[in-house]
């Protein structure tokens, strides 16, 4: 069964933004046409499930679904930890997401290569003007 899912607690660059296509491709490589497990509690205003998507690691196709796709996006610098929604995460997930983003920034990977990457929420707001 196919469902539309928004990854909880991260925000990725929009299509028209730097790293938007790369972020989308990385996520697609992780989850497209794969069996995933989704831990969720709500839907967004567009009817999408908002949740944590767990998938098998590409390095171990016979392993259980133990790779958090949102955390994977953060670790390669292709998303922001969406602190606005941090309270909806478990304390453990908050800690992992914060750490992944901090480490990606320190390594200057993905969008953190740019001197001042524009968060997608600011990009969307600018598009409305």
Predicted region positions:
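Small beta-barrel nucleic-acid-binding modules, primarily SNase/OB-fold domains
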Residues: 1-129
